[in-house]
């Protein structure tokens, strides 16, 4: 019988500070692996780049956005089968670790609701002024994109300086995702994790989004 090592949440936090993150090969994997890509995807949010069509939708406030109300449901939504793939890198160990990180105050979920139903969202990890985006999901068109807009607005409001998307993915091109090498990423990471920042979760979502319009520097 192969031995399964127990990984503590604190190990995951330490990995993030080094620019390393965990993933499982599949939902049925018993363990996880750690990755440090040579090329990293970083999302700009000072100011954020939001497509014009999505910006118009965002102003209509189509969904109710909440934070950390049902973290397990968000990670389960991210792990659910999708039209383009039936497998996921979120296995039981990943789920357990990130729920533990949530309970410790490091992992956060942004949740989109409509008529009381969770219809999309995302989750990630905050350390200092860095936010490490992990995964997102939608059960209704644009739900995860709206959640991402709210995340970027709050990161900007709270003095964050880095939004790590890990990889450069096609669906994030519309948000101006930037590709940087690991050396440049490490410099940004070191600055970010030593930056004093806060998600300011006591500040209403309406005020956070309104700050985008006041800033008048949102690009599209």
Question: What kind of feature is each model-predicted range?
Answer:
Residues 1-220:
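N-acyltransferase acceptor-side catalytic subdomain
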């Amino acid at each position: 019988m192969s031995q399964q090592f127990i990984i503590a949440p604190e190990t995951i936090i330490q990995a993030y500070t080094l620019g390393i993150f965990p993933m499982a090969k599949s939902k049925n994997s018993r363990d996880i692996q750690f990755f440090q890509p040579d090329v990293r995807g970083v999302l700009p949010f000072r100011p954020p780049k939001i497509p014009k069509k999505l910006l118009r939708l965002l102003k209509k406030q189509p969904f109710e956005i909440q934070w950390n109300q049902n973290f397990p449901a968000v990670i389960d939504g991210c792990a659910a089968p999708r039209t383009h793939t039936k497998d996921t890198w979120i296995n039981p160990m990943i789920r357990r670790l990130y729920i533990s990180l949530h309970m410790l105050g490091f992992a956060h979920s942004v949740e989109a609701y409509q008529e009381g139903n969770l219809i999309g969202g995302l989750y990630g990890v905050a350390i200092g002024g860095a936010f490490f985006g992990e995964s997102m999901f939608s059960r209704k068109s644009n739900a995860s994109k709206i959640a991402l807009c709210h995340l970027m607005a709050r990161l900007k409001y709270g003095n964050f300086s880095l939004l790590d998307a890990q990889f450069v993915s096609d669906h994030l091109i519309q948000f101006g995702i930037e590709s940087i090498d690991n050396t440049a990423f490490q410099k940004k990471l070191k600055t970010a994790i030593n930056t004093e920042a806060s998600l300011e979760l006591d500040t209403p979502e309406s005020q956070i989004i309104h700050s985008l319009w006041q800033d008048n520097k949102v690009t599209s």
